[in-house]
Swiss-Prot record:
Stated family: Belongs to the pancreatic ribonuclease family.
Protein name: Eosinophil cationic protein
Coiled coil: none
Region forming the signal peptide: 1-27
SUBUNIT field: Interacts with bacterial lipopolysaccharide (LPS) and lipoteichoic acid (LTA). In vitro interacts with phospholipid bilayers.
Sugar-bearing residue positions: 84, 92, 119
GO biological process, one term: innate immune response in mucosa
Region (Required for nearly all of the bactericidal activities): 28-72
Organism placement in taxonomy: Eukaryota, Metazoa, Chordata, Craniata, Vertebrata
EC number: 3.1.27.-
């Protein structure tokens, strides 16, 4: 007879713990609103090469982010996408606060090419430029955000 090592309750706690660790890897630094963090991660009109552009994000998160997309547009243009018709978010089908861009924008997608990097100063990325539609999730602004925009982008859901 084999001893029972894990009860269903322990398995659930382990799973929730792993999800918490994964969620914390993608957590927004507390000094930023969701919209501010969105802008830092995804808005860059003239991004340099990925390895350089990703340093800011990696410095805040203290790790090498696996991938990221920079939209080569302004925050104001992305706010305007929030005025488009609401759709179900392609990546999170339970959310209905997504909006699809009306036109393709230039972008730079970055893929980590050395995932075993132990130090954020050694993160290296492959550059994949493109021109695509995108979908953002939008929410009412945080009181710390500029009152100029009542609804702001908070999440880049997908690139089409």
């Amino acid at each position: 007879m084999v001893p029972k090592l894990f009860t269903p309750q322990i398995c659930l706690l382990l799973l929730l713990g792993l999800m918490g660790v994964e969620g914390s890897l993608h957590a927004r630094p507390p000094q930023f609103t969701k919209a501010q963090w969105f802008a830092i991660q995804h808005i860059n009109v003239n991004p340099p090469r990925c390895t350089i552009a990703m340093r800011v994000i990696n410095n805040y998160q203290r790790r090498c982010k696996n991938q990221n997309t920079f939209l080569r547009t302004t925050f104001a243009n992305t706010v305007n996408v929030c005025r488009n018709r609401s759709i179900r978010c392609p990546r999170n089908r339970t959310l209905h606060n997504c909006h699809r861009s009306s036109y393709r924008v230039p972008l730079l997608h970055c893929d980590l090419i050395n995932p075993g990097a132990q130090n954020i100063s050694t993160c290296r990325y492959a550059d994949r430029p493109g021109r695509r539609f995108y979908v953002v999730a939008c929410e009412s602004r945080d009181p710390r955000d500029s009152p100029r925009y009542p609804v702001v982008p908070v999440h880049l859901d997908t690139i089409i």
